[in-house]
Amino acid sequence: MSLSFKAHVQILLKEHRGERVFRFEYLGKYYWLKQPEQLKGIWLLLKPHPKQHFKEECEILQHLNNIGAPVPKLCDFSDDYLVLEDAGPTLNIWLNDETLSWAEKLHILHSAIEILINLHQQGIIHGRPAIRDIAWKDGKISFMDFESHSKSHNEHWLITRDILAFLD
């Protein structure tokens, strides 16, 4: 990305300090800026090491972008933020859109399940492919928020868990 994009991101970081995720526009395109969680109280015990988890999320996104997986484009990142290109509305938004026919909704869902199966065939596990974490734009499915932190090495179990999360 251009230096001016990076400069714009730095300004946004100052304006949105502590805001976990927000959408912004730059030169007519939309992006999402995400920052590490800032946990307090009991959440520190329930979700320890938020900076480490954020770093792992960046590494996963880098890898998935490099292999051409169906994820939003990672445009910029550091230890303190990441910027993703907007991948469109999520499936839950599409499915609640009363202007779409059931045939159109089924087409979107069918596309998502085909891509999820394709990910699994490549040995990629999502961890929790909820419809709120799957976007659809211009006929293209993108998966977000990979959460495969399971200690299990049983690929069949992990794939089954993904399918159950998708169907939930």
Residue ranges and their predicted role:
Residues 64, 112-119:
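Conserved hydrophobic alpha-helix
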